[in-house]
Amino acid sequence: MRKQLGDRLPKFTPEQRALVQGSNDFYGMNHYCANYIKHKSGEPEPQDYLGNLESLLSNKAGQDIGPETQSPWLRPYAIGFRKLLKWISDRYGRPTIYVTENGTSLKGENDLSKEEILEDDFRVWYFKEYVTAMADAYTSDGVDVRGYMAWSLMDK
């Protein structure tokens, strides 16, 4: 992270580092989608949390990473979720992970009838894909993921 954001991150004293290093009980993760990234030339703006990276919704061939939703930034891609779980596990010494929020919006959902809203095949597909990806991360990749909370109507 320091490589990406440089001096925009605070510096810890050795005492502060010793205090926080290894002190977490679990890793809580909100996740909705994944993105492609590419290097961006020049210096990033001071408030640009991506540093010198550009976040993209399609690959070099112009293929979208996932289907459109009501939220322009949210494109479901469950494989990216699994890869991120594995990366976090490898990077941080296999911490216990709880997915504290995960979900999607549906393109055009504000215009649907009650009957159409109740027959929500898109979210059924989304949760099946994401829960399966999480289960695969646990069983095949050795990720210590222990809990999952869905993004629901109670969150907004």
Regions found by a protein language model. Give the residues of each.
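Non-catalytic scaffold segments within catalytic domains of secreted glycoside hydrolases
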Residues: 1-156
